[in-house]
């Protein structure tokens, strides 16, 4: 169990080591290292998700460890209250940034290889690795904050939403 202590309250997360062992261990290691302390939720979109884990106040990006393998093919869905890894367009680029789904976001799920004409297309999706077990009221407060643009970043809270510390039990 991991608790994100924020300036809005606590969010307790149960990690799924059975279905997402690499991703859960990666997140836990960042927690143990104190990496998430004093980072911000830097992207907040009501009706979608709240994203954090990589930026400090002022949108300063933190250096991360190497990317991990995408484990989205684990039958876990991006439903409300789940936590998943953020990444770039490269399916295997997740490092430290994560998001908590504030709605059911099935379009983010892994889709198996499908035949489209002569082409086989695979939708990698975003790897879910846990679920909020306490503190969805805190997540729901965060999703309502006022946002704007900061540099080339969009949907940035106008006042910092800070992960002050993380505890592990």
Swiss-Prot record:
<dbReference type="InterPro" id="IPR002130">
    <property type="entry name" value="Cyclophilin-type_PPIase_dom"/>
</dbReference>
<dbReference type="InterPro" id="IPR024936">
    <property type="entry name" value="Cyclophilin-type_PPIase"/>
</dbReference>
<keyword id="KW-0413">Isomerase</keyword>
<comment type="function">
    <text>PPIases accelerate the folding of proteins. It catalyzes the cis-trans isomerization of proline imidic peptide bonds in oligopeptides.</text>
</comment>
<protein>
    <recommendedName>
        <fullName>Peptidyl-prolyl cis-trans isomerase B</fullName>
        <ecNumber>5.2.1.8</ecNumber>
    </recommendedName>
</protein>
<dbReference type="InterPro" id="IPR029000">
    <property type="entry name" value="Cyclophilin-like_dom_sf"/>
</dbReference>
<dbReference type="Pfam" id="PF00160">
    <property type="entry name" value="Pro_isomerase"/>
</dbReference>
<dbReference type="GO" id="GO:0006457">
    <property type="term" value="P:protein folding"/>
</dbReference>
<dbReference type="GO" id="GO:0003755">
    <property type="term" value="F:peptidyl-prolyl cis-trans isomerase activity"/>
</dbReference>
<keyword id="KW-0963">Cytoplasm</keyword>
<keyword id="KW-0697">Rotamase</keyword>
<dbReference type="InterPro" id="IPR020892">
    <property type="entry name" value="Cyclophilin-type_PPIase_CS"/>
</dbReference>
<comment type="similarity">
    <text>Belongs to the cyclophilin-type PPIase family.</text>
</comment>
<feature type="domain" description="PPIase cyclophilin-type">
    <location>
        <begin position="1"/>
        <end position="168"/>
    </location>
</feature>
<dbReference type="InterPro" id="IPR044665">
    <property type="entry name" value="E_coli_cyclophilin_A-like"/>
</dbReference>
<dbReference type="GO" id="GO:0005737">
    <property type="term" value="C:cytoplasm"/>
</dbReference>
């Amino acid at each position: 169990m991991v608790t994100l202590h924020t300036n809005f309250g606590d969010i307790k997360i149960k990690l799924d080591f059975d279905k997402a062992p690499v991703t859960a261990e990666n997140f836990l290691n960042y927690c143990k290292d104190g990496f998430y302390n004093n980072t911000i939720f830097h992207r907040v979109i009501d009706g979608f998700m709240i994203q954090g884990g990589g930026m400090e106040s002022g949108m300063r990006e933190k250096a991360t460890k190497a990317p991990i393998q995408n484990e989205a093919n684990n039958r876990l869905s991006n439903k409300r209250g789940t936590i998943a890894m953020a990444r770039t367009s490269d399916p295997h680029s997740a490092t430290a940034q994560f998001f908590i789904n504030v709605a059911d976001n099935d379009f983010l799920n892994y889709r198996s290889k499908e035949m489209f004409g002569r082409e086989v297309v695979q939708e990698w999706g975003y790897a879910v690795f846990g679920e909020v077990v306490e503190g969805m009221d805190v997540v729901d407060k965060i999703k309502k904050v006022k946002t704007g643009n900061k540099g080339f970043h969009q949907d940035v809270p106008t006042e910092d939403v800070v992960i002050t510390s993380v505890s592990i039990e």
